C-alpha cells in the first residue's frame, strides 16, 4: 500500500516535522493533459503552502506519454487570495498565465522528469504543475497522486472552508 508505506511516511514526516495524514488521492489511468495549476486554491493546509503532494509512477513514464511536470521555483511566487472580483477558481488558467508572465518564470522552464515505476515526485501546494499532452497511442501514464497535511493541521478548501479530517 503506497499510502501506508514507511518510506513515504518518513519523507512526509521530514517535510512536516510531524506525522502526516493523507487527505486525498487520485488514480490516473489515461493520458489526458492537465493544465498547469496550483493545488492551493482547491486544497491546502490552514497554513497555506504546507500541503505536500506526491505523484507516484505506476509504470515507466515514456516521454511521449505526456509526463507530469513542475515549474521550479514557482512555489516562491506571491500567492493572490481568491476574492470575489478575481475569481481565481473559475479563471485559474488565466490566473496562472498572468502569474507566469508577471514573474521571472518562463513557460519553457517546466521540468518533466523521467520517472520509472515506483518513483515519486513531491511538490507543495503553491508549485505550478500539470501533465503534458500525450503523443502516443500505445504508451500510458498510469499514476497515483496524493495530497497530505501535517496531522494536526486543518484542511482548507477553496481558501475559505475548513474541513474536518479525523485521523486515528
What residue spans do the PLM features occupy?
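Short, conserved phosphate-binding/catalytic loop or strand-edge motifs used
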Residues: 28-32
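Non-heme Fe(II)/2-oxoglutarate
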Residues: 1-4, 33-34, 80-85, 91, 117-122, 126-168
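Short, conserved beta-strand element in jelly-roll/cupin
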Residues: 44-63, 114-117, 122, 147-151
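Signature of the catalytic double-stranded beta-helix
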Residues: 1-25, 47, 58
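Double-stranded beta-helix
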Residues: 63-128
Amino acid at each position: 500500500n503506497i499510502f501506508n508505506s514507511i518510506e513515504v511516511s518518513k519523507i512526509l514526516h521530514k517535510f512536516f516535522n510531524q506525522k502526516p495524514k493523507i487527505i486525498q488521492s487520485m488514480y490516473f489511468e489515461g493520458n489526458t493533459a492537465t493544465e498547469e495549476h496550483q493545488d492551493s486554491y482547491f486544497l491546502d493546509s490552514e497554513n497555506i503552502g504546507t500541503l505536500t503532494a506526491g505523484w507516484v509512477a505506476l509504470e515507466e513514464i515514456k516521454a511521449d506519454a505526456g509526463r507530469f511536470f513542475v515549474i521550479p521555483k514557482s512555489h516562491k511566487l506571491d500567492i493572490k487570495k481568491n476574492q470575489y472580483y478575481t475569481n481565481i477558481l473559475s479563471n485559474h488558467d488565466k490566473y496562472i498565465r498572468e502569474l507566469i508572465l508577471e514573474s521571472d518564470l518562463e513557460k519553457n522552464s517546466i521540468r518533466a522528469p523521467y520517472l520509472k515505476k515506483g518513483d515519486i515526485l513531491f511538490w507543495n501546494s503553491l508549485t505550478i504543475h500539470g501533465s503534458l499532452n500525450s503523443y502516443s497511442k500505445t504508451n500510458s501514464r498510469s499514476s497515483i497522486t496524493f495530497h497530505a497535511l501535517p496531522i494536526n493541521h486543518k484542511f482548507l478548501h477553496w481558501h475559505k472552508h475548513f474541513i474536518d479530517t479525523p485521523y486515528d
